[in-house]
């Protein structure tokens, strides 16, 4: 039965990790109705490490762009020195941008999980960023031109600014992709570049978060049995496959549409969560 739950959770992770609707928020909701029959320590680790499947999809889909020594496609010759230089610069921007979230997130991670990993905080963050998306798309974007239309032209300073918004996503319900996209739009980065840079920015952040959770899991005296390993592996594989589809969907979507729909979705979901939390509290 846990393997079926792992498949469902993998689907949820694969969809919500890349769309700006908060994967953590959706996993909190899912945990209310689809609980793994495992220890609390394993479930805490599972909710983070499942992201490995999602982030590996980025590495696979964008391998040609992320690997400075790879061919652009099978028919191309080796990358030119200029293309190699641009790839290394992209990695430097990603690493620079990941620093604030790492510096602030590492010491605060456990405290934030303890105090904000609940329905009500998640609901409020869903609503707040939902409103932010709608306001930015309807009020800010129409009055400001996009100044960065190519990821290779993204300034280092802009990359750092975007990650300062990613720091806000440490609060469950915010959405890592949502926070970085909001930040990118505010500083004049196009929707396409904002989405793509968000994908890349997730690589060090999510690998790092998964490594830390695994380390804490074993450091606290826990062990991983064969069934738990299988459940985690299945969830990661499903998240990987679904993420491939979700990423392609988002990259195509932002070419023709803005993020208003996601803002509305977040607001509706946040309100539903608040009603559910109030109803649950009323029933005791």
Swiss-Prot record:
Quick one: a GO biological-process term for this protein? Answer: cell wall organization
List the InterPro entries.
Answer: UppP
Membrane topology of the entry: Multi-pass membrane protein
Main location per UniProt? membrane
Q: Which GO terms describe its cellular component?
A: plasma membrane
**What is its subcellular localisation?**
Cell membrane
Keyword Membrane attached? yes
Keywords per UniProt: Antibiotic resistance, Cell membrane, Cell shape, Cell wall biogenesis/degradation, Hydrolase, Membrane, Peptidoglycan synthesis, Transmembrane, Transmembrane helix
Q: Where are the transmembrane segments?
A: 7-27, 44-64, 90-110, 116-136, 167-187, 197-217, 229-249, 259-279
Which Pfam families does this chain map to?
A: BacA
Could you tell me what reaction this enzyme catalyses?
di-trans,octa-cis-undecaprenyl diphosphate + H2O = di-trans,octa-cis-undecaprenyl phosphate + phosphate + H(+)
Q: Please tell me which top-level EC class this enzyme sits in.
A: hydrolase
Its Gene Ontology molecular function terms?
Answer: undecaprenyl-diphosphatase activity
Keyword Transcription regulation carried by entry: no
- What EC number(s) are associated with this protein in UniProt? 3.6.1.27
Q: What else is known?
A: Bacitracin is thought to be involved in the inhibition of peptidoglycan synthesis by sequestering undecaprenyl diphosphate, thereby reducing the pool of lipid carrier available.
Similarity field: Belongs to the UppP family.
Q: What does this protein do?
A: Catalyzes the dephosphorylation of undecaprenyl diphosphate (UPP). Confers resistance to bacitracin.
Please give the name of this protein: Undecaprenyl-diphosphatase
